[in-house]
């Protein structure tokens, strides 16, 4: 899959997000410049900059080196623990799984401009879904804290590309956290295709996901 096709999702994801959250339509956000910037950053990180052809494909791979050094410096004196109760001890045990891979994940986040950790439960274990900036769109803020965002991920099965668009919203007023998922199928990686019902998903990864939580 070409990198341009892989990261072009923001251009067609906007229309879907607008339908999910018309009051905060993404037309209010300047994604064009950021989309182009993230694409360039990812190309550099993968050591595939567009200008490498002019250099006979010989590069110093500085993008990955710089991102790795940023992540190393961040983690040198980093310490984080969850304490205070039996529940905290359990959460700390789960949290340590993230800490083991945090430096590698941070490197990718440094390369593309940001990262978000989204926990989920599988077989009774809390696992971290590490989502880089090119895979989510913030929608709402409260005192600088993101209170609504849309996440994107894609799975390939056979000749079909399955896309999950997940909107998460937290309300301080109601103290509620809602998750709304929509699923799409397409024969092309750069086209979101048609929305389908969850029960029609040919995807083991999302087959048991409740579309409204």
Label every model-predicted segment.
Residues 1-131:
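Extended, helix-rich architectural segments
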Residues 116-213:
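Extended, regular secondary-structure scaffolds
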């Amino acid at each position: 899959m070409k990198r341009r096709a892989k990261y072009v999702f923001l251009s067609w994801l906007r229309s879907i997000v607008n339908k999910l959250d018309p009051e905060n339509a993404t037309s209010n956000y300047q994604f064009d410049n950021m989309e182009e910037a993230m694409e360039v950053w990812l190309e550099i990180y993968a050591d595939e900059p567009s200008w490498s052809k002019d250099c006979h494909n010989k590069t110093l791979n500085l993008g990955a080196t710089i991102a790795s050094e940023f992540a190393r410096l961040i983690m040198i004196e980093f310490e984080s623990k969850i304490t205070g109760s039996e529940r905290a001890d359990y959460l700390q045990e789960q949290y340590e799984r993230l800490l083991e891979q945090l430096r590698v994940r941070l490197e990718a986040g440094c390369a593309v401009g940001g990262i978000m950790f989204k926990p989920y439960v599988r077989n009774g274990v809390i696992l971290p879904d590490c989502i880089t900036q090119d895979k989510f769109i913030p929608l709402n803020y409260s005192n600088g804290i993101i209170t609504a965002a849309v996440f994107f991920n894609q799975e390939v099965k056979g000749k079909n590309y399955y896309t999950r668009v997940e909107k998460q919203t937290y309300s301080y007023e109601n103290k509620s956290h809602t998750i709304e998922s929509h699923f799409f199928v397409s024969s092309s990686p750069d086209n979101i295709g048609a929305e389908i019902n969850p029960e029609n998903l040919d995807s083991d990864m999302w087959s048991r996901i409740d579309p409204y939580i």
